[in-house]
Amino acid sequence: IPSVQASGNIRQILMDLSKRYQDIIIDAGGQDSEALRSAMTVSTHMLLPFRPKRRDLKTLVHVEKLIRLAKAVNPELYTRAVITQCPTLPSQVQRILDAKEACESFDLIPLNNFTCNRNIYDDADENGLSVFEMSSDEKAKQEIEQIAKEFLGDL
C-alpha cells in the first residue's frame, strides 16, 4: 500500500493524490492541526475516535466547532464517531452508552459498533501492522470489519 507523509496544509497533496487513487485514508493524529483542518475541506468521510473517558469526551465541544467549520467549506463531509478502547466487563456497558449519548448531544452520530480494549491493537501498532496481518484475534478482526462496513457501507 503506497503511503505519503505530509504535514501543514495538505489540501493540494490530497487533491493530487485523488487523481491517482480511488481511496485515500488520512490519519491526522489526535489533535487539532493544520493538516487535520485542510484534510477536512476535501475529504468525503471522517471517522472520529473517542474513548469512553471524560478526557476524550471533553473535546467534543471543540470537535463540534471544527466539524461546523469544515462543513461550511465541504457540506458533503460525512462525519461519524466511533467509541474505541471500551472496557470488556459487562458492568461497564453504561460507560459506552454514555459516551455515545455525549457524542449525540454534540450532533455527532456514533457508530453502533465499537472496539474493545485489547492488547492486540497496541501490539499491531508497535509492529506497524494491522490486526489482520498480526494475529488470530478473531474478535479484534471482527470489530474492525464491522466498523468499516458500518462506516463505509457499500463504497
Which residues are covered by each model-predicted region?
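Conserved C-terminal guanine-recognition region of P-loop GTPase G domains, centered on the G4
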Residues: 58-76, 84, 88
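Beta-strand-loop-alpha "switch" segments that mediate conformational coupling across diverse proteins
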Residues: 87, 99-129
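Inter-motif core of Ras-like GTPase G domains
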Residues: 16, 33-54
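Inter-lobe coupling/hinge region of RecA-like P-loop helicase motors
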Residues: 121-148
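P-loop/Walker-type NTP enzyme "switch/lid" segment
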Residues: 1-26, 30, 34, 73, ...
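Structural beta-sheet core signal
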Residues: 26, 48, 81-83
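Charged helix-capping and loop-helix junction motifs
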Residues: 65, 94-100
